[in-house]
Amino acid sequence: SLHAPSALVLTVGHGESAATAVPLRAVTLTCAPTASGTHPATVSACAELRGAGGDFDALAADAGVMCTREYAPVVVTVDGVWQGRRLSYERTFANECVKNAGSSSVFTF
């Protein structure tokens, strides 16, 4: 294969940390050699991750979204391989709306 593997498992759960949150949903996202998986927007999520160099903290928030200030924390985890490198990521958002606005499509599942 000409492409290093990029295969990720993303989860979301209610809570402030992955250690205490029960995963509510889990999706798979494979970006090489082609976009596939159970993520609802594989092509755009892979394009967004490539644009950020695989850096989840560099994903651009969707500026047009207004969210309430309700505190109902959700935690997203990402584990797997991105372009041949092991990856483990965790991020807590104030609520589901803020999570969905945290990227164009990667966190929208």
Curated annotation (Swiss-Prot):
InterPro entries: Prot_inh_I16_SSI, Prot_inh_SSI_I16_CS, Subtilisin_inhibitor, Subtilisin_inhibitor-like_sf. The keyword Transmembrane helix does not apply. The record marks 69-70 as: Reactive bond. The keyword Chloroplast does not apply. Disulfide bonds join 31-46, 67-97. Transmembrane segments: none annotated. GO terms for cellular component: extracellular region. Strong inhibitory activity toward subtilisin BPN' and, to a lesser extent, toward trypsin. This is Subtilisin inhibitor-like protein 7. It comes from Streptomyces ambofaciens.
